[in-house]
Every structure is written in C-alpha cells, then in structure tokens.
Amino acid sequence: ECVELVDDLYKFRDCYFETHSLDDATRKTSDVAQQMEQTLKKMEEQEQSLKHKAEFLLQKGRCLNVAQDFSAVAEECLSRAVKLEPGLVDGWNALGEQYWKKGDMIGARNCFTGALQQKKNKVSLRNLSMVLRQLPAPDSDSAGKQVLESVDLASQAVAMDEQDGTSWYILGNAYLSLFFTSGQNQQFSTKAFSAYAQSEKVDKVASSSPELHFNRANLFQYEEMFSSALAGYSRAAALDPSWAELTAKEKQLLEYLEKVTELAENKGKVKARRLRTMLSNLSSSALGPCSSPQFRSPSGRVGSLEPVTLSSLKHGHNAGVAALGKVVFSLASEGRMAFTFGMVDSEETCMVVTVYNTANSWGVLIGDSVVIPEPLLKRHSITHKDKTFDFKSIRVDSPLLLIVNGKKQNIHSQIVTSISYRPQHE
C-alpha cells in the first residue's frame, strides 16, 4: 500500500496540469509539498505493520524525493534502504537523484552505475546520461566523449520504453549538447528537435515540463526561429512562474527584436549627410582577398566573388557573390547568442547581420567596411502576443568568414558558443 501512496503522489505532481489550470501554476510547489506531508502521515500510520524495514525506508525516501530540492532525511532513508537490501534498484536511483540535487555528481554517478549493475533499467540509463553532461572533463576530447556516451545512454533508455516522454526529453538534451560540442553539426539540432517533439507526442506529462519548453526555445533562438522561441519561453514561464529566468528570456528576445527592427528601419539613425560620406569611400577594394581568383569561399568554391547589392540577394545561400557595405549600428545585447550589426550598401539598403561564435572582444565599428562572402539570407516574419516583426537578415556562423576593412579576421575573434540549458531537476 505504501508503494501505491507514493505512486499516487508522483502522479499528482506529474499530472498536475491535467487537474489544474495554468493559473494554479504558482501553487504547484506548495500543493505538492502539502500532498507529500499527507502521504508521509498515512505511511507512518502503517509503519508498524510493515515487516520489510528496507521497503518502508525506500518508499519514505521516494516520497521525500518528490520535491525539487535536496532532503537530508531522504538521503538517510535511501542510504539505509540500499544498505539493508543492495538489490533495490529504485532505492539506488532515488538516492542518485538526491546526490544530483545537492550537486554531488560523482555520488550520483556511482548510484546510477550501481543500479545498472543490479539490473538494466531506463531510469538509471537516462539519469546517468544527465550526470555525464554535468561532470567536469579534464579536456575537450574527454568532454566530447562524455557527451557521445550521454547520447548513447539516453538512446538505450528510449529503446527500453519508447512511450516514456522523460527519456525522449533527456535524449533531446543530449543531442542539444552534442550539437554544440560537435561544431554545431545541423543533423544533431534536427535530432534534438525530433526527440523533444517525440517526448510531447508520447507523453502528456512531458508537454507540461517547463524545462522542455525552455531548452527547446534556446535552440529555436539559436536557429533564429524567433516565433517558436518566444512561444517556448512564454509557455515555460506560464508552467513555472517562480523561474525568473524564463520571463527574462522572453522579454530580452522581444527587446532585441524591437531594437533590431527599429535600427534597421532608421539605418542606425545615421544622418543622411554622414551616410553619404561613409558610402562615398565604399569601393570594391574593400573586397580584399575576395577579389582574388584563388579565394576559397566557405562553401569550398575557389574563385573571385562578384560584389552585389543587398536588394539582389535571394533567400538562402548566395553562391559566387559577396555582399558589401558600411556598418551603421551594432548591438551586443544582454544574454546574446550573436553579435548583431546593420550594414548599408551603395543603394542605401540596410540589412541586419547576425554573427555567431564571436569572442567577447570581437566587434565591428560604425563606418567599418564589411564584406560577407556567399551570404545566407533569411526572412523573418514574427508574431508574438500583440507584437509583429518583419525583416530580413544575413546569418554568419563565424567572424572568421567576414572581411572587415579589407582584412580577414584574427583566429582569436572566434569562440565556439555553448548554450546554457536547464537540466531536469528530477
């Protein structure tokens, strides 16, 4: 009966929004805590009649483990339970989650590994996947191996039960990490999106996980899918109003889009006379190495590039050509994922440019001449709540691809972006 009581408690927590509206989100933590206290009371009434001490300790530990934060009492109950009965896989898993909550990743790893030695199970596999991504690695090679192993463990968890949304979600996070440790290989962001979608599809509980919406929104923002990012941050904030970072992310992204569109429309607010002077010394000599027949483009094409106007660029990748203009504004926004600037060409067309993987010290100044070899043009049409944004931009994946004032950029101008995502606090 104790097992049923605790299972019901977890069901209450995980299916909270099936019986409550989003307006109750602020009460969820206290409602779960109240339910936990009631469950403990009922369990303690039955304690005397229980013959198996280890089983009672396990269920009491599981009950306390329902809360987001570390519980010393839970740790003690679970430690005693697995000492009495080392074969209790659920005990090892719950104890590992307690170590995770107090930040002891080595202790957590040992528990999940120990549980797997008793019996292969999806909970240990996916939890170990999470732990491996949080463990510090001595060097980038080891870090890469840890992330690959993390993907493998989460995949094994999914294979054991394809209807478990939590395993799919953790696989999504593993692919998200792999995307950033593998030089931002597009196939891994696609796999992350696909795992997140599967998590929602197979499991109603997963779709009310604020972490899923937040982590996916981070990836949407990096991929410049701004409408989806805003919707994700907004949904996550509604599901967990106590998590301040969420409302901040949504607000930051909206402010960024407002600023960018306003600056692009006003050509960086540069006065007409100054703009004419700036553009008068914009010549094809600014092309620098791009004008050489030996120039190797990012796509691998060898040969000089033809300078073209911004208005003549087509949607997507523009092979064999280079966009050329003067910087009229730059923006290194708070919580930024990209260095953003605006450039104006000889026709006085203004274009937003987003540059990724930039070192904090790197930037361009108003008046600089910038050449973008084989530009990637994107069109944004964004609607969120009562706001709409419509603009075009050029995405550049590294400052090393740009020619500024006729020169290639120094290797130190690039630092590979990593994304901060919130691991599930299970």
Where are these regions (language model features)?
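Conserved structural position within tetratricopeptide repeats
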Residues: 45-48, 80-83, 113-117, 152-159, ...
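Residue-level detector of the short coil/turn that links helix A to helix B
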Residues: 68-69, 103, 136, 145, ...
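Residue-level recognition of tetratricopeptide repeat
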Residues: 53, 88, 121-122, 164, ...
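TPR alpha-solenoid repeat register
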Residues: 56, 91, 124-125, 167, ...
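OB-fold (S1/OB) nucleic-acid-binding surfaces
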Residues: 318, 328-357
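Short nucleic-acid-contacting surface segments enriched for D/E, G, S/T with interspersed K/R
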Residues: 357-373
